[in-house]
């Protein structure tokens, strides 16, 4: 493995951790409806637990209401129960074969909790990025130790890896700040 490979792999892994972080952020509730909020809901389907998206179509009706359209008529009650029992604090209402999930307004205390959760997710993403930086730097040091790269190349590689790390950490900070704004907007 060359230094270029290490840098490329590290950046790709950092990009993957940012994507995972964005997915986790999408699940944090804001005052607005977001279909991704229900991604974590598991529904019993023929004896096994499956994600809601595999048994129903989830979409937005308006800024405060999510609609869930089961693909099978008999699934409505199970989907409603799964949403109600998820720890999202949502109360679905069945309207024939359509389930409406209104988003209750969040209290100030709940908003602060969600903001704290977003910050914690951000910290976790930063730690993941920093761990990837450490692993990359160790790989570069191993190349130098095995005489496959010079110390000058090591310094350059570590500086490049640090730049990539700084870029990804700045992206995490920006995403957290945007999510906090979204949560605190009434």
UniProtKB/Swiss-Prot annotation:
Coiled coil: none annotated. Pfam families: RRF. HAMAP family: RRF. The keyword Cytoplasm applies. Responsible for the release of ribosomes from messenger RNA at the termination of protein biosynthesis. May increase the efficiency of translation by recycling ribosomes from one round of translation to another. GO terms for cellular component: cytosol. One of its GO terms (molecular function) is ribosomal large subunit binding. The keyword RNA-binding does not apply. Keywords: Cytoplasm, Protein biosynthesis. It comes from Paracidovorax citrulli (strain AAC00-1). One of its GO terms (biological process) is cytoplasmic translational termination. This is Ribosome-recycling factor. It comes from the Bacteria. Belongs to the RRF family. It is found in: Cytoplasm. Its main location: cytoplasm. InterPro entries: Ribosome_recyc_fac, Ribosome_recyc_fac_dom, RRF_sf. The gene is frr.
